[in-house]
């Protein structure tokens, strides 16, 4: 499988698919899958292209990934052209090499090889591929999941090919993620001249005690699977830019990465209580990016651990840290979900790269997971 994985990865990298532009990546994948009997369903939403490809019937084992990549930044800082896909000393360089065209290619080749060997396999193999993960993530996996739910189509197990490995290939399997919720808070005051404060009402001064309480509040202590919930102020702004004007409004944007000990409703209620306690006039808009999820040790987690040990000779660690991914949408279907892929040390950076031997092992691991889960049905 190794040569096929590397060749497909290079072909995908050579298509400059800056999110949400697919640039023909999914068509390339679709042609390979269709050639071995996969049924293809195109699910475009807005500016996003999505592919749902299936083979067989029954319990569904899905692979999920994205063809879109982040911008390259300053191209002059790249040692090798970001869309050339050059291999140097066993490292494949290019935007998307690690996040996540390499893992996506490994998934496609693993599924393709599996159905060639076992065309009448048990269950259903599916690939869910989107071009909207790196940017808004509004017309991609979330919309495909909504479509599947509406027609009572289920995913039982799902491997998301995000680059999960941290310092050594295979050291981390993500079996959950924290939730993410952002508050956009507008605290009202009365604008005026700084020389006449009695004729104004400074929202910055009024908010200081509230902000101190908000940033020091302990939401929970975490649990055996998740670290404690954390809150960070991301943006804050007030004033006109002039030094003689008391601002009329203070804008504060803050984000919480929260564990399963709290809910988004608990967070909203507590923040409202704090605001009322400090007698602030305010408006707050909430944006829930994703709820926390956890896949406990079971068939999928155990199969993934076994596969990683077999092909890397190390025992992976289960982890729920990091940012959000499309796994959060798939988890809402009740699926067992894990994320596993190559090293994440160069993702979104200049000179993004991946070890081609790691990509080959990715393919072997994905193939083994299919074997293991279908044999246990």
Swiss-Prot record:
Which EC number applies?
A: 3.5.1.18
What does the entry comment about cofactor binding? Binds 2 Zn(2+) or Co(2+) ions per subunit.
Keyword entries, A-Z: Amino-acid biosynthesis, Cobalt, Diaminopimelate biosynthesis, Hydrolase, Lysine biosynthesis, Metal-binding, Zinc
Q: Which reaction does it catalyse?
A: N-succinyl-(2S,6S)-2,6-diaminopimelate + H2O = (2S,6S)-2,6-diaminopimelate + succinate
Question: Is Amino-acid biosynthesis among the key words of this record?
Answer: yes
InterPro entries, sorted: ArgE/DapE_CS, Bact_exopeptidase_dim_dom, DapE_proteobac, Peptidase_M20, Peptidase_M20_dimer, Peptidase_M20A
Q: List the active-site residues.
A: 68, 133 (proton acceptor)
Cofactor(s) the record lists:
Zn(2+); Co(2+)
Q: What class of enzyme is it?
A: hydrolase
Q: What's this protein's family per the entry?
A: Belongs to the peptidase M20A family. DapE subfamily.
| Record function comment | Catalyzes the hydrolysis of N-succinyl-L,L-diaminopimelic acid (SDAP), forming succinate and LL-2,6-diaminopimelate (DAP), an intermediate involved in the bacterial biosynthesis of lysine and meso-diaminopimelic acid, an essential component of bacterial cell walls.
Self-association and partners = Homodimer.
Q: Which NCBIfam families match?
A: dapE_proteo (TIGR01246), PRK13009.1 (NF009557)
UniProt name for this protein: Succinyl-diaminopimelate desuccinylase
| Organism (species) | Histophilus somni (strain 2336)
| Taxonomic lineage from the root | Bacteria, Pseudomonadati, Pseudomonadota, Gammaproteobacteria, Pasteurellales
Give the gene that encodes this protein: dapE
